[in-house]
Amino acid sequence: QSLQDTAKRMIDGGKKVAYLSNDVMQHSFYASLPPTEHGSYSVAFLKKHGLPPARQVRIGVEGVSERLRRSVSKPISDEDLIGCTRWLNANGKSVRWFMIAGLPGETDEDWQHLRDIIQRWKTLTPKGVLALSFTAFCPDPATPFATVALDDGYWTRFLDFREWFFSGREWSNRVKIMQPQQPDSRLKKAMLSMGLSELQLREGGYISPNSRLLYPYA
């Protein structure tokens, strides 16, 4: 209770508070702590305890479509994503979606899906700011997609998306986009992380020497 009271007093006084722990969510009292600028909270928690003072709320969306999000066990529906964003906008918060470009299995249709939900958000939300930050998928050792072949198709799909965004009536100063890493820089990062050659990464199926885990499907 003392920690809760102290945190609330500091936040109400305009202080920036961060909870430091190896795993803050393991503590039984975590759910009762006041939300801070930096933290991970459910919409239900924020509705009950109030929004943090931060002007922007970041959402780790991952895939550019609902189909891709389900494939990586993060089944955020379009309705929930748009609804949550609209609610935050209505409460004076700008929102940033963090998305991964080039998840395994990504197609042109997934990016069309993203265009559609951006248009829906714009139609349903007369006031508010939405930013989209893209990160290029990069394999890491000991992860489920570590052995998937590296594919640069995401970059062409992003360029098409960017052209759509800036070239016509779809453009809006209420929507901001930050591009993912280009293929060359993504490749360098993957080679360093995985300890594999470009040929091995593009062929796929190779287990990283930096990995301590062996997946049965690799």
PLM regions: where:
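Auxiliary Fe-S-binding modules of radical SAM enzymes
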Residues: 4, 8-12, 29, 89-90, ...
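Conserved SAM/AdoMet-binding glycine-rich loop
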Residues: 1-131, 139
